[in-house]
Regions:
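Conserved catalytic breakage-reunion loop centered on the nucleophilic residue
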Residues: 1-197
Length: 197
């Protein structure tokens, strides 16, 4: 700041770039703040891991085919309104149909895609996917079908830690392979059996 003739004042921390003695302590204060952030991060991750290992669903929105239990928002119940769609997707896959063919079959039935259904159930943040075209609400993507077929949640298992977090500062979180995911079995009723999955 000083070399650009900018004065920085932080009243709460007692920092004033014109005061040399206050500036001498600033690097140490930054180190302490960094340590505090790291400590809080570790504690939050630990609390989330403990809840996950107890079989608690931690997502904000239930996966397609499920609703959150009104008595326990960390438990999933089958959503009878759309569970038949999930079953049909698995039945078609078990009959040897590929993802593209399954997608075409579902699209012909004019079924709300998962994001549109979530919005109808009160979820927010998904509108951008189809706000420009009402018909988009009924167009399933191959990724939606693939996601359902690959998710252990549909067999009653909770899957988590699907990404690698390098450190608390990094926004990059590459995906792990499905066999590297942490899975807690039998946390809720499955829409399909373990064998079908």
């Amino acid at each position: 700041f000083p070399e650009h003739n900018v004065r920085y004042i932080a009243v709460n921390d007692g920092v004033d770039t014109l005061n040399k003695s206050a500036m001498d302590i600033t690097p140490f204060r930054n180190i302490l703040n960094e340590m505090y952030s790291a400590d809080v991060s570790v504690k939050i991750k630990s609390a989330y891991r403990a809840r996950f290992q107890q079989g608690k669903f931690m997502g904000t929105t239930a996966p397609y085919g499920y609703v959150k239990d009104p008595a326990d928002h960390n438990h999933l119940l089958i959503d009878d309104k759309v569970a038949h769609v999930v079953r049909e997707i698995f039945d078609l896959a078990l009959a040897g149909n590929g993802i593209a063919k399954i997608r075409k079959h579902i699209n012909k039935q004019h079924i709300l895609r998962p994001a549109a259904y979530a919005v109808e159930q009160g979820a927010t943040g998904y509108e951008r996917y189809f706000e420009d075209n009402e018909e988009n609400r009924y167009i399933w993507s191959e990724n939606s079908v693939r996601g359902i077929l690959r998710s252990p949640i549909y067999a009653g298992n909770l899957a988590g830690y699907k990404r690698i977090a390098a450190n608390m500062k990094s926004k990059k979180r590459p995906s792990k392979l499905p066999e590297e995911w942490e899975v807690i079995p039998d946390t809720h009723e499955g829409i399909v059996t373990q064998e079908e999955f």
